[in-house]
């Protein structure tokens, strides 16, 4: 089954190519499948896929071998999203993460996207900001909704938002790696983007700022260093992901009353 899943990663590249894409990003972070093999917190296997770091990296290498072979045939670029740290004790920390990143560099990928966090253990470490628990539970299935409303505040650690919140850790990887690196994390202004680029990162990624305003990149191009996103990081858009219809709260005038009340109370 493991070999089949790795082969499926290669087939996914074909699907992306046929859909018209020029680049794929292999998600090896945030506690998803590849990340679960890499992290000592989730990987308790006692075979060739668990234990030592080289063993825990084996599945990643298998997936990338398939992806790189197909991408080369399709003339597509390949990025890897990589956790600098999982965000909790017992998970991947920076020294081990640097070892993984150095190995990824030798695989011939076109760049690494540096992130952090673990969706099942430290979800807000990924994005930072406020946790609208009622809103989040509103879009979940009924059984999960009850659980989140009762226990969410005790289980989900909060991480205050600050601009460029991953930058200092990301610089440690920039100092050790030669391949192109993509910075992501808390980019909401032209000044912040310039700070990341001036720190040696070839590219940047944004998400919530573009959910708030799809034309934000054009405004950055036309504006000055003070140009800034109107996103206030109340994370309604993140909570709404469970509905498979991500939208910014500022563009939803018909929000249910309790959601409006919760968002209004958030600082």
Regions found by a protein language model. Give the residues of each.
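Flavin-dependent oxidoreductase catalytic cores
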Residues: 1-267
């Amino acid at each position: 089954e493991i070999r089949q899943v790795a082969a499926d990663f290669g087939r996914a590249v074909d699907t992306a190519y046929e859909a018209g894409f020029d680049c794929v990003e292999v998600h090896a972070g945030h506690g998803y499948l590849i990340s679960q093999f890499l992290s000592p917190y989730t990987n308790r296997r006692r075979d060739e896929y668990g234990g030592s770091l080289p063993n825990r990296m084996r599945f990643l290498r298998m997936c990338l071998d398939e992806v790189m072979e197909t991408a080369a045939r399709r003339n597509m670029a390949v990025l890897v999203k990589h956790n600098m740290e999982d965000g909790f004790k017992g998970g991947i920390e920076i020294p081990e993460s640097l070892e993984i990143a150095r190995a990824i560099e030798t695989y011939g990928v076109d760049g690494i996207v540096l992130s952090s966090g673990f969706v099942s253990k430290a979800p807000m470490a990924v994005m930072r900001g406020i946790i609208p628990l009622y809103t989040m539970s509103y879009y979940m299935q009924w059984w999960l909704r009850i659980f989140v409303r009762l226990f969410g505040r005790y289980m989900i650690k909060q991480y205050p938002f600050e601009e460029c919140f991953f930058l200092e850790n990301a610089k440690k990887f920039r100092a050790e790696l030669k391949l192109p690196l993509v910075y992501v994390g808390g980019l909401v202004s032209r000044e912040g983007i310039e700070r990341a680029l001036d720190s040696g990162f070839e590219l940047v990624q944004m998400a919530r700022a573009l959910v708030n305003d799809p034309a934000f990149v054009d405004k950055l191009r036309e504006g000055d260093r003070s140009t800034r996103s109107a996103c206030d990081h109340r994370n309604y858009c993140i909570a709404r992901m469970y509905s498979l219809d991500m939208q910014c709260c500022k563009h939803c005038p018909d929000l249910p009353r309790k959601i409006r009340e919760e968002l209004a109370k958030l600082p």
